[in-house]
Regions:
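Extracellular and organelle-lumenal recognition/adhesion modules and their flexible linkers in secreted
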Residues: 1-219
Length: 219
């Protein structure tokens, strides 16, 4: 996008803010606009203005709402929920580790999806080392490709890493992923993933729950 268009959007936002009229939808759309145009710092400021009353300030290197207690935004730095045939993704208030909900997905055995069940853009600092952790619980997850956590550079190259996929039936297993942010990278995409299988028996069935996701800078 041209600089003139970015400046015009900024002036329009400032005018709207002065009038005291921005809605939550306005905040989220403008936050998305700033992220898309490479202004993660500005987007973070807008995001924190939106959530200032909830005392839930987001800082670089932190996952937003790792216990799934906030409404899903599908925009900004919030959770973005995926879609694919044969997959139902929802917040589960019955099976959880902490808080009100876990993220759950049910696979009906009809498809072989390559899907991010949920993902979010996380602002980070280049050259810094971080650890992502979370808990995954499964029930009768089939195929050789199960559920894993993944990080990759957002609008930058040189970073893609993931945990080992979890299959079968298991109680809550802690997953940990360490990574260093490459030069020039201002944000990552963190995802809860299932990759498509290349096996003949590749149609996945079963259920999965994910909860208590965290990200912290390492010394």
């Amino acid at each position: 996008m041209r600089a003139g268009q970015r400046d015009a959007a900024g002036r329009a936002w400032e005018k709207l803010a002065r009038l005291g009229a921005p809605t939550k939808g306005d905040y989220l759309k403008y936050c998305d606009f700033l992220i898309t145009n490479g202004n993660e710092t500005g987007a973070l400021a807008i995001w924190n203005q939106l959530y200032s009353r909830s005392n839930a300030e987001l800082k670089p290197g932190r996952i937003w709402d790792g216990n799934f207690g906030q409404p899903v935004t599908n925009k900004g730095f919030g959770w973005r929920i995926g879609q694919a045939p044969g997959v139902r993704i929802f917040l589960d208030g019955d099976i959880k580790m902490a808080g009100q909900y876990s993220l759950s997905a049910s696979f009906d055995g009809s498809s072989n999806p390559d899907i991010s069940l949920a993902s979010q853009i996380v602002p980070v600092e280049a050259g810094h080392r971080y650890e992502v952790s979370g808990y995954v619980k499964t029930s009768r997850i089939t195929t050789d490709n199960g559920i894993f956590l993944q990080v990759q550079g957002y609008d930058c190259s040189g970073l893609q890493a993931g945990t080992q996929p979890v299959t079968g039936t298991s109680f809550w297993q802690k997953q940990i992923l360490d990574f260093t942010v490459p030069s020039g990278c201002k944000a990552i995409m963190f995802s809860i993933r299932r990759a498509a299988s290349t096996s003949l028996d590749n149609r996945i069935s079963g259920d999965v729950w994910v909860d208590s996701l965290k990200m912290a800078e390492q010394g």
